[in-house]
Amino acid sequence: MTKKYNIAVIGATGNVGRETLNILAERNFPINKVYAIASDSSLGREVSFGEKILQINSLKSLHFDDIDIAFFCAGSEVSKEFIPKATASNCVVIDKSSLFRVDNQVPLIVPEVNLSTLKEFNTKNIIANPNCIVIPLAVALKPLDNEIKIKRVVISTYQSVSGAGKAGMDELYDQTKSKYVFGENDPKKFPKQIAFNIFPHIGDLNKDGYTSEEAKIASELNKIIGNHFKASVTSVRVPVFIGHSISVNIEFNDKIDAKEVEEILQDADGIVTISNNNYLAYISPVEVVGEDAVYVSRIRNDVSRDNTINLWITCDNLRKGAALNSVQIAEELINNYL
């Protein structure tokens, strides 16, 4: 008989929390009972879980003794306050905030890349889910690095507003609507107008000129893949609702060409490659909404630098960039560790 688990999704009314519930249902995760948890302001609301409707429960009233696995999807402050309570009750936590990602005692997992490090989870009973840009980057970069070591990476991200939560999506919608009726809608969630605009500012601005988002991406990539290369990152917010895209310039330590890169990626787990032989041979954000794969296209040689490749990565940031990755981690946990 298949063992079933009690699951809690904390932040169940947010973008990632709702998607986590959707994916748990889609993939028939063996659940005995599922708890949809959010702040007190969300009490009385309902969320979908497959064909079922779940009532929102309060985090403050949740008994972690009753929970086997908790998905934390509510940000670093909530994680900081409540994860110690969860782990003290022997609940395994999969945390989607940035709080534990660079903690050396907490594995930072992308299942296609570094599942072998998952065995370290029981040091703290916490597994960290990487940044929503780092996940597709790691899926694409690791199989290449396995073949020929990467020397450096230059990354420009084009991140949708859903990465900033429902408030970010609402702000894009409201500003767009206001522009069509000649109204004004001042930015609240974002530092500048997002409708019909882009800006290279995600997270806080650091003293070195990089943003906190850019620093996270570089440090998390090194933790997952290795410290033998450096990454220079520019993170850009774009007026797209769902779907992150990434322009990547990769310099290798040895000779490689675009054809070889394409062949390596075609054999890699979790990737769909688009050949340059096709007309419109690239994937845009609207095409990946609801998709689980990481799409890689525009694979080409950098004509300005030897041993260097350019490519374009696109994925659904709410699915593989967040919720799906964490559910895949949970599947591995119950198959081999719990």
Curated annotation (Swiss-Prot):
Gene Ontology MF terms: aspartate-semialdehyde dehydrogenase activity; NAD binding; NADP binding; protein dimerization activity
UniProt enzyme class: oxidoreductase
Annotated protein name in UniProt: Aspartate-semialdehyde dehydrogenase
CDD domains reported in the protein's UniProt record: ASADH_C_bac_euk_like, VcASADH2_like_N
Pathway(s) where this gene product acts: Amino-acid biosynthesis; L-lysine biosynthesis via DAP pathway; (S)-tetrahydrodipicolinate from L-aspartate: step 2/4; Amino-acid biosynthesis; L-methionine biosynthesis via de novo pathway; L-homoserine from L-aspartate: step 2/3; Amino-acid biosynthesis; L-threonine biosynthesis; L-threonine from L-aspartate: step 2/5
PANTHER family (UniProt xref): ASPARTATE-SEMIALDEHYDE DEHYDROGENASE, DEHYDROGENASE, PUTATIVE-RELATED
Gene3D superfamilies given in the database record: Dihydrodipicolinate Reductase, domain 2, NAD(P)-binding Rossmann-like Domain
Assembly and binders: Homodimer.
Reaction catalyzed: L-aspartate 4-semialdehyde + phosphate + NADP(+) = 4-phospho-L-aspartate + NADPH + H(+)
Annotated positions binding NADP(+): 13-16, 41-42, 162-163, 187, 317
EC numbers on record: 1.2.1.11
Entry similarity comment: Belongs to the aspartate-semialdehyde dehydrogenase family.
Species assigned in the record: Rickettsia conorii (strain ATCC VR-613 / Malish 7)
Function: Catalyzes the NADPH-dependent formation of L-aspartate-semialdehyde (L-ASA) by the reductive dephosphorylation of L-aspartyl-4-phosphate.
Top-level taxon of origin: Bacteria
Active-site residue numbers: 132 (acyl-thioester intermediate), 244 (proton acceptor)
Disulfide bonds: none
This protein's UniProt keywords: Amino-acid biosynthesis, Diaminopimelate biosynthesis, Lysine biosynthesis, Methionine biosynthesis, NADP, Oxidoreductase, Threonine biosynthesis
Residues annotated to bind phosphate: 101, 216
Alphabetical list of SUPFAM superfamilies matching this protein: Glyceraldehyde-3-phosphate dehydrogenase-like, C-terminal domain, NAD(P)-binding Rossmann-fold domains
Annotated binding of substrate, by residue: 159, 237
Biological processes per GO annotation: 'de novo' L-methionine biosynthetic process; diaminopimelate biosynthetic process; isoleucine biosynthetic process; lysine biosynthetic process via diaminopimelate; threonine biosynthetic process
